[in-house]
Regions:
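Helix-coil boundary/capping segments in enzymes
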Residues: 1-207
Length: 207
């Protein structure tokens, strides 16, 4: 493996003192993925699965639980497009079950998946499918809103429209999310905070 992909080696260059090592911590945002096999020997520098997660959570902090955040992994390759992200929830649940066999290690305690909120009212069926496959771990969705007119600025992977937070269909989708007592996670640029503020005022019960 080339040094370019030696991420653990890069991280190990600096060791910081662990503050309050006994304080229980929930890691609120991580991903899990197989990644492509890119090296001639079949090794995979992009892989990040349960053992890799534990390697990080056992760095000296007292990390008890974690929350998985959607990253487009293991989507179904069949069926209606809107339901394909449910495959990611199923994938993470299986890893969570593996983790439960090692109760002394950090446990995956929540899943934030993806549902296209532009489905509007129809998003409810997809949310319910995630919830069924989530076996008690599915907590909500991330639909990122990051957008900028400057082509040199990377827009969010979910390909949002310019003012997606203000779209009627998007807000109707979030109403379904709120009605199911699920949470909404997003990311956006600073110049979109005003749109998010309008959204929050329009849906005050949304978590």
């Amino acid at each position: 493996m080339s040094n370019f992909y030696d991420i653990p080696g890069w991280l190990d260059q600096i060791q910081e003192e662990i503050l309050e090592p006994d304080r229980p911590i929930i890691d609120p945002h991580h991903h899990l993925w197989h990644g492509p096999e890119t090296e001639q020997d079949g090794s995979n520098p992009y892989r990040y699965l349960l053992e890799d997660l534990w390697n990080d959570t056992e760095s000296g902090h007292n990390i008890k639980k974690t929350v998985f955040i959607d990253c487009g992994q293991e989507y179904y390759d069949h069926g209606p497009d809107e339901f394909r992200p449910v495959g990611e929830t199923e994938f993470v649940v299986e890893l969570a079950k593996q983790a439960q066999k090692n109760p002394d290690k950090a446990q995956i305690s929540g899943i934030i998946g993806h549902v296209d909120m532009m489905l509007g009212d129809s998003s409810r069926e997809v949310l319910e499918a995630h919830n069924e496959k989530g076996e008690g771990l599915f907590r909500g969705i991330r639909h990122s809103g990051g957008w900028d007119a400057d082509e040199s600025v990377r827009n969010a992977h979910s390909e949002p429209t310019e003012q997606i937070y203000l779209e009627d269909r998007f807000q109707r989708g979030l109403e379904q999310l709120s009605d199911l007592d699920m949470v909404f996670d997003t990311w956006h640029y600073h110049n979109q905070i005003s749109d998010l503020t309008v959204l929050a005022k329009a849906l005050p019960s949304l978590k």
